[in-house]
Amino acid sequence: MEGSLAGKLALVTGGGRGIGAAIARALAGAGARVLVCGRNKPDLDVLAKEIGGVAIRCDLTDRAATDEMVASAGHVDVLVNNAGIAESASLERTSDAMWDRILELDATAPFRITRALVPSMIKAGWGRVINIASNAGVSGYGYTAAYCAAKHAMVGMTRALAIDLARTGVTINALCPGWVETQMVDEAVTRIAQKTGRSLEEARTSLAQMSPQRRMIAPEEVAYAALMLCSHDARGIHGQTIVIDGGAVLK
């Protein structure tokens, strides 16, 4: 798909590392100019220099800062709503603050950014919105009520907006990865090891074994799917939830 996005501008939130960084590299490799947005400016700067993009530091839980970031971006052809957090707790330990924090970043911020940028895509007659949800958005897992709720919200938003956008030239889809080899998963492995007394290797293996393929997903596999959705030939893929977890949700 080299050159297929030449002349297009993409915005990737949570673009400094992990899945977001892999998607930013893939889009840039296809010719797009990429704006990478996130909270860790050093990571963003390194990636932006690597791909010839632009680093934008922004905390998406700050609505005023988010509005300013979106306004400065102007017209965007490809929007990848990737920024998110994952926290786990039992029901009684899921505080209002935790619930609000996860829902704000994982559901409300993507909605607000999409609402701001899609009208310009409609006017141009072409656009791609790719929401990075999770297989937790099509299933349920213990101790993750807030996270599952947020990712289900993202999937629901994707499906509803697909109806609204069906005749505009703008497509919207959700990618739903399982456990992906990222720093976020490294942090989850550490928490599991601390809580259960397992070694880090045992904790990591337990996550990998949730997939029938007995492995985690590479960030580049998610990036490949995102790039595919940006292609002309994918224009009929619309309002879909594409699960990338090695078959874990089938178990």
What function would you assign to each model-found segment?
Residues 166, 171, 237-239:
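Short, small/polar-rich loop/turn modules that mediate ligand/substrate recognition or access, typified
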Residues 9, 16-17:
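Conserved glycine-rich cofactor-binding loop
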Residues 114, 150, 158:
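Active-site helix of classical SDR
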Residues 90-91, 98-103, 207:
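Substrate-binding pocket helix/loop in short-chain dehydrogenase/reductase
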Residues 119, 163-164, 235:
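Alpha-helical segment proximal to the catalytic Tyr-Lys
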Residues 134:
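Residue(s) in the substrate-gating loop at a strand-loop-helix junction
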Residues 126, 213-244, 249-250:
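C-terminal substrate-recognition "lid" of short-chain dehydrogenase/reductases
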